[in-house]
Structures are given as C-alpha cells and as structure tokens.
Amino acid sequence: LTWTLPNAEHAYGEWMRVLKTGGVLLNFDANYGKDDASDTKDLPEQHAHFKVGNEMLEECERIKAQLPISRKNRPAYDVAVLCENTRGEIHIDQELGKRIYLEKDEFYNPAPMFSICTVKK
C-alpha cells in the first residue's frame, strides 16, 4: 500500500536502509492515484465499491488528492526512487494484475497492478 504513504520516497529510503545485505524488497501496488474511485462504469455489480457508498468514495478521492505519490507516474517513480537508494538490480512486473484478476468479481481491481523486486547489495 505504498500509494497511501504521505512520503513514499522516505519510506523507500528507510526500507532499503534497514534491509540487510542480500535482503529482498517486494512491493505489490498499483497506480491508484490515476484512478477515480467513484468511476464504477466498468466494475461488476457485486464489486466492493458499490457497497461503501458515495460519501466514502468521495473521501477517498480527497485523501488521495493530498498524497504526492498520486501525481506520480508509477511504477516509473518507484524505480527512480529505488535507483537512488540501492545499487542492486530492480525487477518490475507490470503484468501482475492480468494474472491475478482472471475474472471481474467483488475483488477485481481495475488499476493495473505491478510488482517491484530488488535485492540490497
């Protein structure tokens, strides 16, 4: 849930700082900042967003607008930040969502999910 952090850049720096040499950082996330939580036209009728109500979806949008990471192009932003904090290789999987969301059910996530993996050198 990196996208919910008020200072993701600092978080990445701290994660890499405390990770021991040879340790693995895995991040599974999506570019939620680009999505409008209240846009439900492509969601199945049993999707969770229909159960939370418009007030909560609007609050989500207000909170998201305050988070700097919401204005970033992800995962490119994440990779750039990690490049500043590690000498290790960084692997990105931008097809993750296609493999884990095989059907549009109540858990379906329309934001394209990605994973990032790096090993601290």
Per-range role (PLM):
Residues 1-8:
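A short SAM/SAH-binding and catalytic strip from SAM-dependent methyltransferases
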